[in-house]
Amino acid sequence: MSFKMDREEYAQHYGPTVGDSVRLGDTNLFAAIEKDFTVYGQESKFGGGKVLRDGMGVSATETRDNPSVVDTIITGATIIDYTGIIKADIGIRDGKIVAIGRGGNPDTMDNVDFVVGASTEAIAAEGLIVTAGGIDLHVHYISADLPEFGLDNGITTLFGGGTGPADGSNATTCTPGKFHITRMLQAVDDMPANFGFLAKGVGSETEVVEEQIKAGAAGIKTHEDWGATYAGIDNSLKVADKYDVSFAVHTDSLNEGGFMENTLESFQGRTVHTFHTEGSGGGHAPDIMVFAGKENILPSSTNPTNPYTTNAIGELLDMVMVCHHLDPKIPEDVSFAESRVRKQTVAAEDVLHDMGALSIMTSDAMAMGRVGEVAMRCWQLADKMKAQRGPLEGDSEFNDNNRIKRYVAKYTINPAITNGIADYIGSVEVGKFADLVIWEPAQFGAKPKLVLKGGMLTYGVMGDAGSSLPTPQPRIMRKLYGAYGQAVHETNLTFVSQYAYDHGIKEEIGLNKIVLPVKNTRNLTKRDMKLNDYAPKTIRIDPQTFDVFIDDELVTCEPIHTTSLSQRYFLF
């Protein structure tokens, strides 16, 4: 005899199912369940008197020698990923996702995809949301506290450059030369996050960049503060092509070495990742945004300009002055800062993101951006665009899935593809490392509940350890066991060039983390950017008014006074 439950009661017990929608934080975005892999009446739920007990949902006989037995089951999760919005159990074994479907005991349950045994831990995610760990491709390694602040917003992978608060690192995302690359690789070896380092892309000879890739850099960054010249870009791209590493550029704001067209010519159709493609973070003034329409360019934004608010412009001017070592007493320095900040291009940037013309969201951490706000700003922007532009094509009432999948891709899979690490991380898919973020729907985008790194709980909301339960206040984000000891080395990744990997960089400099090579970075086009592959035929910026036109139509939006995911969640 079957037992019937009404939809509301079912959702309270087992989480939403097909036909239900979940509101994301205090935004007006609703994620609708597209498919439910669990079986009604046979859900694998943990707890006293529930299913995951010996001989019921837990196999009484299967040992870990059976590869179908997982180390961890995340039960009844609502998964939000570029691949879809689904309800499923997630099986994790040896630090990787091995199954997404239905977990339990095959002796008592039908159609089980993976086995829960005596060796299996359970994380109850009924009513919770699971996303892939976020990836920030634009981090200035200035403070050693950056990984912790990133984890606060579900960012588990950092790419960038720097050596600490040196002026070169304050301004540019480059870790220059073998000495600094080696020492920084060693410095982050005990930090609970994945890391990659960008070499300094300058010089009229390829050898000056090549030696940095051999030393373990996982990509190349050309920055105007070190000189973004035609020769420097061309030679850096030659090295990138030779060693299969990503190439990123912060172009010439002052147009000293050439204009936007000259830089575009220096690319020669080769794959390029353009930082802060709007321009306030730097780049050809006023028309760097033209790059967002080129097939060989993978364009990203930095989060201080997203979403466009009434306070954005004033904040940006101050940030430019501090970040780029400018003197407010020197008129030319002030003019330099003012040339980079244009409300018209900031307004257009929001719309280009919503159209899928800007593919990636990053932070520019500590150098005009905030590492702990990458995911949050993404969802604030998505919410703003829904309010100002309405539903995307295919979306409907209580179903914003197309927009949600577009925006989650901006800080998960697309940065992974761009920097050659998508085989390892960047999505909730079988075979990838279990870098996962678990959210309560009411806190989604603002504050994670738990962060897993390589299948181990590493960071999360935790109460007073001196109390009788884990729930008493103060409940704040704290390091968990995965952030300590040898566990850090077994659950976190360091990315290097294939050359450095093949030549034993891990052993040479004594790294303990899992070291992996980046790959497949050089034949990418805009079409490889998941759900964010729109390349307008023409993007034109009026040199006098700075108005932005896409295919001859003005693109703009209004600033907002308040955002979602803001003061309702934070004291300051």
Swiss-Prot record:
At which positions is substrate bound? Answer: 223
Matches recorded under CDD domains: Urease_alpha (cd00375)
GO MF assignments: nickel cation binding; urease activity
- Pathway per the UniProt entry: Nitrogen metabolism; urea degradation; CO(2) and NH(3) from urea (urease route): step 1/1
Q: How is the cofactor bound?
A: Binds 2 nickel ions per subunit.
Reaction it catalyzes: urea + 2 H2O + H(+) = hydrogencarbonate + 2 NH4(+)
Q: How is it modified after translation?
A: Carboxylation allows a single lysine to coordinate two nickel ions.
A GO BP annotation: urea catabolic process
Describe what upregulates or represses it.
By low pH and excess glucose.
Q: What is its main location?
A: cytoplasm
Top-level EC class as recorded in UniProt: hydrolase
| Keyword annotations | Cytoplasm, Hydrolase, Metal-binding, Nickel
Entry binding sites for Ni(2+) 2: 221, 250, 276
Active site annotation, chain numbering:
324 (proton donor)
One term under GO cellular component: cytoplasm
Q: How does activity depend on temperature?
A: Optimum temperature is 60 degrees Celsius.
The protein's matches in SUPFAM superfamilies, at most eight in alphabetical order, are given as: Composite domain of metallo-dependent hydrolases (SSF51338), Metallo-dependent hydrolases (SSF51556)
Residues with PTM N6-carboxylysine = 221
**Family per record:** Belongs to the metallo-dependent hydrolases superfamily. Urease alpha subunit family.
Briefly, what is this protein's role?
A: Ureolysis may allow urea to be employed as a nitrogen source for growth and produces ammonia which may protect from killing at low pH.
Q: Which HAMAP family does UniProt cross-reference here?
A: Urease_alpha
Complex formation: Heterotrimer of UreA (gamma), UreB (beta) and UreC (alpha) subunits. Three heterotrimers associate to form the active enzyme.
This chain belongs to the protein called Urease subunit alpha
**What is the scientific name of the source organism?**
Streptococcus salivarius (strain 57.I)
